[in-house]
Amino acid sequence: MAEARSGYIAQADGKLYYEVAGEGEILVLGHAGFVDSRMWDPQWEAFTQRYRVIRYDMRGYGKSDPAPGPRNWRNDLAQLLAQLQVERAALLGCSMGGAIMLDFALEHPEMASALLVVSSAPSGFQLEGAPPPELAEMFQAAKQGDTARVSELQIRLWIDGPHRQPDQVNPDVRRRAAEMNRIPVEHRTFFLANTQPFEPLDPPAIARLNTITAPTLVMAGALDNSEIVRAANVMASAIPGAQTHIFAQSAHLPNMEQPAEFNQTVLAFLAEVK
């Protein structure tokens, strides 16, 4: 395994944690909004053998400082890449991390050599239908300070998804996700930083998908919420030349549920678009 180095970049209101390993062209990994950069552990060895890989904990997650309020997540990424002297990279993000990568690629097209999004919806995407019942219960549990229940509901919502019961999901995936989820739940990151946009991309990504020039791969899990799958279809249809891949046995985190297929899919795409 490639030797990793880790560190922090200093920001005006705290520190942001990152890890770097490998040599070659640069690949940046952005995590989902209920876990942290450890979600990429199943990819780390395979990816760092071929690329210089950067992963980071967003503020309020993992080893980074808490997020005191709404953030411009694109700026956090821009500060990280500037600190690491990255001028151009392939951008891979999951869920909220994918939305951030998409916005960043639209704001800084010269910096995106490739764009890979998984389980994401573009900024400005309008959800249809009733929200998952877990959301309302999660907000209520948060008001009551019941962090254990908040975490349980987030794991049900995103790891199990709407089509499975907990006992139908790999228990190790559930355990690792719950471990990562503990920190943002304790920091109330979702409620402090994620529920309202701060300096959102204007116009939002949904209105600009046809302007994306980077080679793009859109991925989703077939067992995820139907709106996430619909968002993937919208992006795949609108982004010029976009490729798609659906993971048949996964919900929101295909990279953890089907790591071998995920790694092969990503590495094949990156090799193709070099």
List the predicted regions and their residue ranges.
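Conserved serine/cysteine hydrolase catalytic core
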Residues: 179-237, 246
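Short beta-strand immediately N-terminal to the catalytic nucleophile in serine-hydrolase-like folds
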Residues: 91-93, 118
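Acidic beta-to-alpha connecting loop that harbors the catalytic carboxylate
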Residues: 23-24, 222-224, 249-251
